[in-house]
Amino acid sequence: MIQVLLVTICLAVFPFHGSSIILESGNVNDYEVVYPKKVTLLPTGAMNSANPCCDPITCKPRKGEHCVSGPCCRNCKFLNPGTICKRTMLDGLNDYCTGITSDCPRNPWKSEEDEMKWSATAKGSVLM
């Protein structure tokens, strides 16, 4: 049997609680069957290599780091305030990082109709 370690990527949606899953696979009538089996210990460095910013136990940024991922996060640190995180095509009202979060906040000068008007190319037809 071949065992494959399923490395859990550290995301808030799928928190890591000190255990992982080993997938045991085998062949049954030429079909590969995978059976999950819970384990509690991981090889040293297995989780550390998944995301260098993330503490594998708490699934939060490591000590001394600011963020794990996001458009305003690079090398585990928030990008400087004023860094463009979302460039617009027509109106020049780009979205900028704040320096205190990894999210890319919407430019407050944009109106709701601007977002609707230029967000995507329309395809299809109008029925009247």
From Swiss-Prot:
UniProt keywords, alphabetically: Cell adhesion impairing toxin, Disulfide bond, Hemostasis impairing toxin, Platelet aggregation inhibiting toxin, Secreted, Signal, Toxin
Signal peptide range in chain numbering: 1-20
Main location: secreted
Domain Disintegrin: 47-111
Pfam families the UniProt entry points to: Disintegrin
GO molecular function: toxin activity
Keyword S-adenosyl-L-methionine: no
Subcellular location: Secreted
Keyword ATP-binding listed: no
Gene Ontology cellular-component terms listed: extracellular region
Disulfide cysteine pairs (residue numbers): C53-C76, C67-C73, C72-C97, C85-C104
Tissue: Expressed by the venom gland.
Highest rank taxon of the organism: Eukaryota
Subunit annotation: Heterodimer with subunit beta; disulfide-linked.
Further information: Negative results: has no interaction with the collagen-binding alpha-1/beta-1 (ITGA1/ITGB1) and alpha-2/beta-1 (ITGA2/ITGB1) integrins.
This protein's name: Disintegrin lebein-2-alpha
